[in-house]
Regions:
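Glycine-rich FAD pyrophosphate-binding loop
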Residues: 1-24
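Residue-level detector of anion-binding/catalytic polar loops
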Residues: 4, 42, 105, 153
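Short beta-strand/turn micro-motifs composed of small residues
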Residues: 9, 59, 168
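Short, histidine-centered active-site or binding-site loop motifs used for metal coordination
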Residues: 12, 76, 204-206
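A short acidic, helix-capping loop that chelates divalent metal ions and anchors anionic groups
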Residues: 15-18, 78-81, 208-211
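N-terminal FAD cofactor-binding segment of flavoenzymes
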Residues: 19-62
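Conserved FAD-binding catalytic core of PHBH/FMO-like flavoproteins
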Residues: 36, 136-214
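Conserved N-terminal helical subregion
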Residues: 48-149, 156-162
Length: 214
């Protein structure tokens, strides 16, 4: 591309070993797979990803067998599956190791200041170093320091929900199916992982979440 790129992050990515486990998982759609393939990261992700070919959604007053449950199936499309469930650390490491990032300079520090001029920016790091650039991309989450330093506002609201996450071995096989039940306090999801495991994601009130973890 001819661009010089610096990636500023105070923490180096952690290389996962074969037994590594991350309670944070993502559902990667077929479109996400195409993006990660173009980024030359998918081949490193797919050995650790579990495809899901079906999805079943129902509410608290129903059961997954009833006709009012929603069902989505890859068999109804021209695709081999609906997507994959994979632990986040696998995606992060695969992207970090992508050949497309070999020309990127990694800077182990945190953002401390931003100044903008016409067509340029100056970045000050916590260790005192300064970087001059034409473009700053803030990809540092909902509490983005880059956004705050750039003076960009935001709007938001509280959902009064907390997610409890865990990996489980269930009494019955997951059958490459994502299961989601909507309860009065929030959705409960069982997402298929490798080795017969499922990822439990239970969104509920803070009080019930504390009770579940007690």
């Amino acid at each position: 591309s001819g661009l010089k790129v610096a990636l500023v992050d105070p923490a180096a990515p952690r290389k996962p070993d074969e037994s590594a486990m991350d309670l944070r998982v993502s559902a990667l759609s077929r479109a996400s797979e195409r993006i990660l393939t173009a980024a030359r990261a998918w081949d490193a992700i797919v050995p650790h990803a579990s495809p899901y070919c079906d999805m079943v959604v129902w509410d608290a007053a129903s059961t997954p067998e009833r006709p009012d449950a929603l069902r989505f199936s890859a068999a109804e499309t021209a695709e081999p599956n609906l997507g994959h469930i994979v632990e986040n650390l696998r995606v992060q490491w695969a992207l970090h190791e992508s050949p497309l990032l070999r020309g990127v300079t990694e800077v182990r520090s945190a953002l401390a200041g931003l100044e903008f001029d016409e067509g340029s920016a100056r970045v000050t790091l916590e260790d005192g170093r300064r970087l001059a650039c034409q473009l700053v991309i803030g990809a540092d989450g909902s509490q983005s320091v880059a956004r705050q330093l750039a003076g960009i506002g935001r709007s938001g609201w509280a959902y009064d929900q907390t997610a409890v996450v865990a990996h489980l071995h269930t009494g019955k096989p997951h059958r490459e199916t994502a299961w989601q039940r909507f309860l009065p306090n929030g959705p409960l999801a069982f997402l298929p992982l490798q080795d017969g495991r499922v990822s439990l994601v239970w969104s509920t009130t803070p009080d019930e979440a504390a009770s579940l973890q007690a």
